[in-house]
């Protein structure tokens, strides 16, 4: 750590949060989890272990739909775990999918697989007694869930661009390298869940009981990383703590990355010390310094991030405390090189290309729309069986996108008809509106303990109502990026939507508008604590104006800004909560 400890380290004068004690006492994340696994009196974990399992990629949850009923019967809530796999760039092999599907059907309460907007899959409803078998299964097929939650670098995103196959492969390889480089070295995960068996992807990193990058108390808070390939911003690159924007040379080869830091979308209702934020640029690094830059940012956050107040512990708050120049200087000191000036780039869109596209390598790629990422079997749509049948015959790979969809990638010309026939048979190819195609939600109720309102379960009908509004005003073929999140923690990325709903209470939401299509602008609160029907009515009025008053090809989010319906968020740490404080030239 630098000797200059004043700027950015004022939090050290306050008591540390209890999470810091927990990590210190955890014996490198082992805790007493093994003892809890033997305790059949409860379906959950006790004491510190409730938090420690998050470092191993799990959260304890319960079915909130039946919580009151079980309370009346004097039973504890129906506890189970969420498991989030580590899957850099979202690439998974068909043979892996077949095993994942089997476990979901046989051992999870909801018999479903949830694709997330962080390019991985989650199990919901895993009973405690099935946790070790689940981790051993993942290990046996070359997967794990290390560091997909808690105070570590989480699953690394990478643009799912099937057309630019060579560039995507180069960027994807760096996403994997970044993920591996920033993993914890502790053997705790292996000792608890795999009984010390060799892990194919991470074993070399976990042999030494030391944490030279993360430190023995790991990071102050969650840490998210993404790799984006312009012009597609499907990973919402401005929404993460650490971001790498791929830059090509004159021959179209990857030559390095622009590095951005300090993005993040979580905040707390009414707490003006919290705010969502788009990332800032540190500059450009050539390929050979990519891992050094990643390590430098992590070490700077490790040493300067707030360990007293977890609500102000993400990278954006560290930058606010240190200033951007101060943060950059510390990162440069850690990696022992200077950033070069930011290279030019442009993002134009962030949605997936639903349907077939052909890559420059002449392979075909089929992007399947999966509403809210939920893969399950319903009588009218047996999607889960459909993906399983695809996995049985597909010779390429699957790619989970940051928009919660699934790409059947690298399909040869002669296999295309068979893949399409299976997808159509099981309802995986369907006609949907542009609005629905670009909509997203978090899981929320009934499993998320933080949920204040519904999200995934209300999204389909809500989008249907908005489709009617767009048809009414003759703009049914247009797209408005719409997202619902059940609380302000930001999992649904609603704060980068043109229309964003943030749960406030059961049946009530805050309506935010004014984000842009490329994901460069935070949306602003427009109406507070209103019902879904009231939101539809508000959007009806706004779309009526947009349909008649917009400029050529003007997006909805840009229109509401230009028309002074809502003020833009220019510098979120200053004006997110109060638009009268907008100072366009403000520099941190």
Curated annotation (Swiss-Prot):
Organism: Actinobacillus pleuropneumoniae serotype 7 (strain AP76)
PROSITE patterns documented for this protein: NIR_SIR
Molecular-function annotations in GO: 4 iron, 4 sulfur cluster binding; heme binding; metal ion binding; NADP binding; sulfite reductase (ferredoxin) activity; sulfite reductase (NADPH) activity
Catalytic EC class: oxidoreductase
Full protein name: Sulfite reductase [NADPH] hemoprotein beta-component
Complexes and interactors: Alpha(8)-beta(8). The alpha component is a flavoprotein, the beta component is a hemoprotein.
CC cofactor: siroheme; [4Fe-4S] cluster
Family matches, as InterPro entries: CysI (IPR011786), NiRdtase/SiRdtase_haem-b_fer (IPR005117), Nit/Sulf_reduc_fer-like_dom_sf (IPR036136), NO2/SO3_Rdtase_4Fe4S_dom (IPR006067), NO2/SO3_Rdtase_4Fe4S_prot (IPR045169), NO2/SO3_Rdtase_4Fe4S_sf (IPR045854), NO2/SO3_Rdtase_FeS/sirohaem_BS (IPR006066)
Family statement drawn from the similarity comment of this UniProt entry: Belongs to the nitrite and sulfite reductase 4Fe-4S domain family.
Keywords: 4Fe-4S, Amino-acid biosynthesis, Cysteine biosynthesis, Heme, Iron, Iron-sulfur, Metal-binding, NADP, Oxidoreductase
EC number, UniProt record: 1.8.1.2
Role this protein plays: Component of the sulfite reductase complex that catalyzes the 6-electron reduction of sulfite to sulfide. This is one of several activities required for the biosynthesis of L-cysteine from sulfate.
Chain sites annotated for binding [4Fe-4S] cluster: 442, 448, 487, 491
Gene from which this protein is expressed: cysI
Gene3D superfamilies the UniProt entry points to: 3.90.480.20, Sulfite Reductase Hemoprotein, domain 1
BP GO annotations: cysteine biosynthetic process; hydrogen sulfide biosynthetic process; sulfate assimilation
Reactions mediated catalytically: hydrogen sulfide + 3 NADP(+) + 3 H2O = sulfite + 3 NADPH + 4 H(+)
Entry superkingdom: Bacteria
Residues that bind siroheme: 491
Cofactor descriptive note: Binds 1 siroheme per subunit. Binds 1 [4Fe-4S] cluster per subunit.
Metabolic or biological pathway, per its Swiss-Prot or TrEMBL entry: Sulfur metabolism; hydrogen sulfide biosynthesis; hydrogen sulfide from sulfite (NADPH route): step 1/1
Any GO CC annotation of this UniProt entry: sulfite reductase complex (NADPH)
């Amino acid at each position: 750590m630098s000797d200059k400890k004043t700027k950015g380290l004022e939090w050290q004068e306050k008591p540390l949060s209890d999470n810091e004690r927990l990590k210190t006492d955890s014996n490198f994340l082992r805790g007493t989890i093994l003892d809890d696994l033997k305790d059949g009196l409860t379906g959950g974990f006790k004491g510190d272990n409730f938090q420690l399992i998050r470092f191993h990629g799990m959260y304890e949850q319960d079915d909130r739909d039946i919580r009151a009923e079980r309370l009346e019967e004097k039973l504890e809530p129906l506890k189970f775990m969420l498991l989030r796999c580590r899957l850099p760039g979202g690439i998974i092999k068909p043979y892996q999918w077949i095993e994942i599907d089997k476990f979901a059907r046989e051992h999870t309460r909801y018999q479903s697989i949830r694709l997330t907007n962080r390019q991985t899959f989650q199990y919901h409803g895993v009973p405690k007694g099935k946790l070790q078998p689940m981790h051993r299964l993942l290990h046996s097929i070359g997967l794990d869930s290390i560091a997909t939650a808690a105070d570590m670098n989480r699953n690394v995103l990478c643009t799912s661009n099937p057309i630019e196959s060579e560039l995507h492969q180069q960027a994807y390889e760096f996403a994997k390298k970044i993920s591996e480089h920033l993993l914890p070295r502790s053997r705790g995960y292996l000792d608890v869940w795999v009984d010390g068996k060799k892990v194919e992807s991470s074993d070399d990193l976990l042999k030494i009981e030391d944490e030279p990058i993360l430190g023995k108390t790991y990071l102050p808070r969650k840490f998210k990383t993404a790799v984006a390939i312009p012009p597609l911003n499907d990973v919402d690159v401005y929404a993460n703590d650490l971001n790498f924007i791929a830059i090509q040379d004159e021959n179209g080869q990857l030559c390095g990355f622009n590095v951005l830091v300090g993005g993040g979308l979580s905040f707390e209702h009414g707490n003006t010390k919290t705010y969502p934020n788009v990332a800032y640029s540190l500059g450009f690094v050539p390929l050979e310094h990519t891992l050094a830059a990643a390590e430098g940012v992590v070490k700077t956050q490790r040493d300067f991030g707030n360990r007293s107040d977890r609500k102000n512990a993400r990278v954006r708050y560290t930058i606010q405390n240190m200033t951007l120049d101060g943060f950059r200087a510390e990162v440069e000191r850690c990696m022992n090189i200077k950033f070069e000036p930011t290279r030019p780039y442009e993002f134009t869109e962030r949605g997936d290309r639903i349907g077939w596209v052909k890559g420059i390598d002449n392979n075909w790629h089929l992007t399947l729309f999966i509403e809210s990422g939920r893969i399950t079997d319903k009588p009218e749509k047996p999607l889960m069986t459909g993906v399983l049948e695809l996995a049985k015959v597909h010779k390429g790979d699957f790619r989970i996108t940051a928009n919660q969809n699934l790409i059947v990638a690298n399909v040869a010309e002669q296999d295309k008809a068979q893949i399409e026939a299976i997808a159509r048979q099981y309802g995986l190819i369907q006609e949907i509106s542009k609005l629905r195609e670009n909509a997203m939600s978090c899981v929320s109720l009934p499993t998320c303990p933080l949920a204040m309102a519904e999200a995934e379960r209300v999204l389909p009908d809500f989008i249907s109502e908005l489709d009617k509004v767009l048809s009414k005003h003759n703009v049914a073929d247009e797209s408005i990026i719409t997202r619902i999140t059940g609380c302000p923690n930001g999992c649904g990325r609603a704060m980068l939507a043109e229309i964003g709903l943030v749960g406030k209470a059961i049946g009530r939401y805050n309506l935010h508008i004014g984000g842009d299509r490329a994901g460069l602008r935070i949306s602003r609160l427009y109406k507070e604590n209103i019902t879904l029907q009231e939101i539809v009515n508000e959007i009806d009025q706004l779309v009526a104006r947009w349909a008649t008053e917009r400029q050529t090809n003007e997006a909805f989010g840009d229109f509401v800004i230009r028309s002074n319906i809502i003020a833009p968020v220019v510098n979120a740490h200053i004006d997110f909560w109060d638009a009268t404080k907008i100072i366009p030239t403000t520099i941190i």
